[in-house]
Curated annotation (Swiss-Prot):
Its EC number is 2.5.1.7. It is an enzyme of class 2 (transferase). Transmembrane segments: none annotated. The active site is at C117. This is UDP-N-acetylglucosamine 1-carboxyvinyltransferase. Pfam families: EPSP_synthase. CDD domains: UdpNAET. The gene is murA. Its main location: cytoplasm. It comes from Haemophilus influenzae (strain ATCC 51907 / DSM 11121 / KW20 / Rd). InterPro entries: Enolpyruvate_Tfrase_dom (IPR001986), Enolpyruvate_Tfrase_sf (IPR036968), MurA_subfamily (IPR050068), RNA3'P_cycl/enolpyr_Trfase_a/b (IPR013792), UDP_GlcNAc_COvinyl_MurA (IPR005750).
Length: 424
C-alpha cells in the first residue's frame, strides 16, 4: 500500500494548473449512458474514481477510449448489460448514478449498494424515492438496488426531503427521457449540477433552472452525441489556496473559476490572505504572514463546502487565535483531527463541532488518511511541519486529486511516494 513521505517547513509558492472537477466528471460520465450517439469529453481528470467509472461503463457495453489529448470518447449506442457489479461498485458510492440513466433509457438497471469514503450516513434512499416517483419499480435484493419500468418514466413534481447533490443528479438524469415535465423542488445548487445539466442540454435535453432550488425538465424521446469540457475542480482549487495560506506562500491557480468559490475566498480573506481573481485564475498571497483563525459552518452550496472543511481545520490549527468549526452536512467528518493532534495541533470535538486553538508549529510524525479530504489536509500539514511526516492509506487521495505529488513539488514541497513494503 502506497504512502507519502513529506519533509516539512516548505513555503509553497508558484503556479498550478487545476484539473477538471471529479464531482462533475463522474455524473457526466454516467449520463453518457443516455446518449444514442458518441460523446467526447475533455478536461476529465485521471483519478481512481474515474478509472472505476470507465470500467463500469465498459462492463455495461459502452465503448470507452482516451485519445492522445486525454479526451474521453464514449459510445453507449450498443449497451447490452444493465448491472453495475459489486466488485467495481464497492469502492465508490458515485456508482449509484448508473441506475437512473439505465432505467430511463433501457427501462431496467441494477447497481450494487455502493462504497466510497466512510464519512457518515450517505443513504441511497433519496435516489430510490426519486426514481419511484417517476414510475420505477425498485427492490433491494441480494445487495443490489434493482429498478425497472414497463414503459418510459413519467414526469412529476418531486420535493427532495433533504438537499442532496446525488439525488438531484439522479432525478435530473432520469427525467430527461421521461414523458412530460418533471419539477425538482429543494434541488441542490452546486456548480457540478449546472455542468451536468449543460452537458445533458448539449445532448438535446430540456433542463432549466439548474443552479437554483427549482429545476424543470421537459422530457424528450432521445438524446444524441455532443462534445463537452468538464468544469474546473473548485475543491482542488481551494486546496491549493490553503497550501499557500498555511505556509506563508503565494500560489496562482490557473484554469479555474472564482465564481464557484465565493464562500471559500471570503474566509481566506478573513484569515488575512490577499486574494486576486481573473476570469480563469485565482492568486493567493500570504505575504509571509501567519493566518488568522476563522469560524467555519458548512452548508449546501452556495454556503461553505463540506469538502473544504478539513483543509480549513488545518489552517485553524496553525492560525493565530481560536476558531469554531461546525459540520452540518456529514456525520463522522472530523477523523483528521485526532491525526492533526498527533502532529501537535490543539482541538476538542463535541458532536458536529470542533474548537481549534492555533499553534505556531506542527511536528512531523506518522499519520493515517481516513477519507479523501482528510488525507489531503494531512499531506499539507506535513509540508509545513518540522521534520518528516509519513501519510498512510493515500489511496484516498488518488481517488480525488490528479498528480498531487507532482503539483505539490511544483510549488516547492518535498514529497515522495513509496510502497509500504519499501519502508526501512
Amino acid at each position: 500500500m502506497d504512502k507519502f513521505r513529506v519533509y516539512g517547513q516548505s513555503r509553497l509558492s508558484g503556479s498550478v494548473n487545476i484539473s477538471g472537477a471529479k464531482n462533475a466528471a463522474l455524473p457526466i460520465l454516467f449520463a453518457a449512458i443516455l446518449a444514442t450517439e458518441p460523446v467526447k469529453l475533455t478536461n476529465v481528470p485521471e483519478l481512481k474514481d474515474i478509472e472505476t467509472t470507465l470500467k463500469i461503463l465498459r462492463q455495461l457495453g459502452v465503448v470507452v477510449d482516451r485519445d492522445a489529448t486525454g479526451a474521453v470518447l464514449l459510445d453507449a449506442s450498443n449497451i447490452n448489460h444493465f448491472t453495475a457489479p459489486y466488485e467495481l461498485v464497492k469502492t465508490m458510492r458515485a456508482s449509484i448514478w448508473a441506475l437512473a440513466p439505465l432505467v430511463a433509457r433501457f427501462h431496467q438497471g441494477q447497481v450494487s449498494l455502493p462504497g466510497g469514503c466512510s464519512i457518515g450516513a450517505r443513504p441511497v434512499d433519496l435516489h430510490i424515492s426519486g426514481l419511484e416517483k417517476l414510475g420505477a419499480d425498485i427492490v433491494l435484493e441480494e445487495g443490489y438496488v434493482k429498478a425497472q419500468v414497463s414503459d418510459r418514466l413519467v414526469g412529476t413534481r418531486i420535493v427532495i426531503e433533504k438537499v442532496s447533490v446525488g439525488a438531484t443528479l439522479s432525478i435530473m438524469m432520469a427525467a430527461t427521457l421521461a414523458k412530460g415535465t418533471t419539477v425538482i423542488e429543494n434541488a441542490a445548487r452546486e456548480p457540478e449540477i449546472v455542468d451536468t445539466a449543460d452537458f445533458l442540454n448539449k445532448m438535446g435535453a430540456k433542463i432549466t433552472g439548474a443552479g437554483s432550488a427549482h429545476i424543470t425538465i421537459e422530457g424528450v424521446e432521445r438524446l444524441t452525441g455532443c462534445e463537452h469540457s468538464v468544469v474546473p475542480d473548485r475543491i482542488e482549487t481551494g486546496t491549493f489556496l490553503i497550501a499557500a495560506a498555511i505556509s506563508g506562500g503565494c500560489v496562482v491557480c490557473q484554469n479555474t473559476k472564482a465564481d464557484t468559490l465565493d464562500a471559500v475566498i471570503d474566509k481566506l480573506r478573513e484569515a488575512g490572505a490577499q486574494v486576486d481573481v481573473t476570469e480563469n485564475s485565482i492568486t493567493l498571497d500570504m505575504l509571509g504572514n501567519r493566518p488568522k483563525a476563522v469560524n467555519i459552518r458548512t452548508a449546501p452550496h452556495p454556503g461553505f463546502p463540506t469538502d473544504m472543511q478539513a483543509q480549513f481545520t488545518l489552517l485553524n490549527m496553525v492560525a493565530e487565535g481560536t476558531s469554531i468549526i461546525t459540520e452540518t452536512i456529514f456525520e463522522n467528518r472530523f477523523m483528521h483531527i485526532p491525526e492533526l493532534i498527533r502532529m501537535g495541533g490543539k482541538a476538542e470535538i463535541e458532536g458536529n463541532t470542533a474548537v481549534c486553538h492555533g499553534v505556531e508549529q506542527l511536528s512531523g510524525t506518522e499519520v493515517i488518511a481516513t477519507d479523501l479530504r482528510a488525507s489531503i489536509s494531512l499531506v499539507l500539514a506535513g509540508c509545513i511541519a518540522t521534520g518528516e511526516t509519513i501519510v498512510d492509506r493515500i489511496y484516498h487521495i488518488d481517488r480525488g486529486y490528479e498528480h498531487i505529488e507532482d503539483k505539490l513539488r511544483g510549488l516547492g514541497a518535498k514529497i515522495e511516494r513509496f510502497s509500504g513494503s519499501d519502508e526501512a
